Amino acid sequence: MHQDNEQLSLNDQMQRRFDERRHLQESGINPYPCSFEVTGHSRQIIEHFKEDAEEKVSVAGRIMAIRRMGKASFFHIQDSDGRMQIYLKKDEVGDDAYATFKLLDIGDIVGVNGYTFRTRTGEISVHAESFELLCKSLRPIPVAKEKEVEGEKVVFDAFADRELRYRQRYVDLIVNPEVRSTFIKRSAIVSHIRSFFTSQGWLEVETPILQPIYGGAAARPFTTHHNALDMQLYLRIANELYLKRLIVGGFDGVFEFAKDFRNEGIDRFHNPEFTQVELYVAYKDYDWMMRLVEELFQQTAIAVNGTAMTTFLGHEISLEAPFRRLTIADSIREYTGAEIEGKTETELRNLAKDLGLELDPKIGSGKIIDEIFGEFVEPKLIQPTFITDYPTEMSPLAKPHRSKPGLVERFELIAGGKEICNSFSELNDPVIQRQRLEEQASLRQRGDDEAMVVDEDFLRALEYGMPPTAGLGIGIDRLVMLITGEESIRDVIFFPHLKPE
């Protein structure tokens, strides 16, 4: 019954707004005009306010609060920078305009022409000389209210239901300024990384999203069909193999901010559609790339937050270089006491069983080690830690280690208990690369549907010759979570994937 009353109230409010819309139109007022000339935004106007000068301004925004007092009214508008108070007097705007103002609601978008002044309470405001309705809102927005309870500020009627916030992100952005702040920081993070890379002379490129063969990661793809060519295509799971082709083609450094797609589970760290930036630099190796990551992450955190410190999942985390380095074998030994070096697949499977892990019998040695690491080590690595020198089975695209047989030159950066980025000294020997991909193909035949496939065109490119190269992939969504302190990937993606309503 309570839900029905709430719905009835919403219907009544919407009907009243539809009636107001009709009344405005009957009065010759277009509730949806084409444009309005804005001369300044709220933050800019407040920052440049001068006590001894009445500056003429034209501002626009959404009405977020109204206080009517007979022949005068105060209301707040919200624009992309913040909020600003508007003062409106009936005697100055005229009877007709003030009557129109009475038809406006919270949520309507207006433009105001006037001059700046400071109220008796000290608030910098705009004294309206005229206003114009720019958009009549037909659906009421949820507006949080505040009151003091025993000396503490209490917020109620807030738009706080998480799933509803994700489904109606447009409303979330209107009423929750901290959400807007997170996405502004996300944009700043991407901009800083892009500037960092381009300042080195590296080229930003674009590679195919629809691919005839998927590769570059161990993951299940989304499939689609090209009608004209009558062929199956895949949404990319990574852009690695195409970027390496560009290194073969003669570029010394390339990077791409890419939407990648993996047909896998959804949780607070995984979304089927996510953003990565991948970077490939010729004549460098994974040790050089570790130093670059340290510099990049420290600079990015400072650029966005003003400090290299961040708080994530209740932990104070420092992104100040240098980061700890630990081989994957040493990390498993440190956190479980188990030894993985030199172990056969059967021995690793028994080891995992002794540790209490239930494993899919179809996976091989690399996946077993990955499961052990993911269960017992990764969640405990809170401060940024480079995990290095992985077994060959775990990294079919990485170069053999120069001094440790059976291992490859690879690192993952773990921070806050999750992988943030992944890097190799890239394998450029086409003979070894073919062997590795054929081994992956045999794992697929055993039933491992995340194993890679043999990409003959990529192998052909390597046969022309690729210089020594360092590669890096950074999960942008997770990096944003780390720097902003958000605890779910859904809070850093504007429109995360959800089950149907």
Curated annotation (Swiss-Prot):
Q: Which InterPro entries does this chain map to?
A: Aa-tRNA-synt_II, aa-tRNA-synth_II, aa-tRNA-synth_II/BPL/LPL, Lys-tRNA-ligase_II, Lys-tRNA-ligase_II_N, Lys-tRNA-synth_II_C, NA-bd_OB-fold, NA-bd_OB_tRNA
Q: Which reaction does it catalyse?
A: tRNA(Lys) + L-lysine + ATP = L-lysyl-tRNA(Lys) + AMP + diphosphate
Example GO biological process term? lysyl-tRNA aminoacylation
The cofactor remark states: Binds 3 Mg(2+) ions per subunit.
In terms of Gene3D superfamilies, this protein maps to: Bira Bifunctional Protein, Domain 2 (3.30.930.10), Nucleic acid-binding proteins (2.40.50.140)
| Signal peptide limits | none
Which sites bind Mg(2+) 2? 419
Names of required cofactors: Mg(2+)
Going by the entry's taxonomy, the superkingdom of the source organism is recorded as: Bacteria
Q: Looking at the UniProt record for this protein, which Gene Ontology cellular component terms does it annotate, in alphabetical order?
A: cytosol
**Where does the protein end up?**
Cytoplasm
Q: Name one Pfam family in it.
A: tRNA-synt_2
Give the EC class as a word.
Answer: ligase
Q: What is its main location?
A: cytoplasm
Molecular functions (GO terms) = ATP binding; lysine-tRNA ligase activity; magnesium ion binding; tRNA binding
Q: Which UniProt keywords apply?
A: Aminoacyl-tRNA synthetase, ATP-binding, Cytoplasm, Ligase, Magnesium, Metal-binding, Nucleotide-binding, Protein biosynthesis
Q: Which residues bind Mg(2+) 1?
A: 412, 419
Look up the EC number in the record and give it.
6.1.1.6
Q: Which NCBIfam families does the record associate with it?
A: lysS_bact, PRK00484.1
Family note: Belongs to the class-II aminoacyl-tRNA synthetase family.
How is this protein organized at the quaternary level? Answer: Homodimer.
| Protein's name according to its UniProt entry | Lysine--tRNA ligase
Biological source species: Chlorobium luteolum (strain DSM 273 / BCRC 81028 / 2530) (Pelodictyon luteolum)
